[in-house]
């Protein structure tokens, strides 16, 4: 292989490594490249699965990251609400206070 071929091949390898590393750094919740966490509407609300946005991109030509982030925010809100309810229930009974 001549020098020009080696230079082009090495630039291709280096740029691929940089892109993969950049995607890994900027991924959300451990998602990597085109694997994106999405909810499966057919299953219970508490379960999440990895969805392939790559396939849906071919169906409609777009990938809406904002919708995925909104789903994550909604799930966090449900967890916080559930946590508050459990805390209120645990402090509501057996506190040792005399109520008249």
Curated annotation (Swiss-Prot):
Residues 28-100 are lumenal. The keyword Transmembrane applies. It is a single-pass type II membrane protein. GO terms for biological process: leukotriene D4 biosynthetic process. GO terms for cellular component: Golgi cisterna; Golgi cisterna membrane. It comes from the Eukaryota. Belongs to the glycosyltransferase 6 family. This is Inactive N-acetyllactosaminide alpha-1,3-galactosyltransferase. It comes from Homo sapiens (Human). The lineage of its organism: Eukaryota, Metazoa, Chordata, Craniata, Vertebrata.
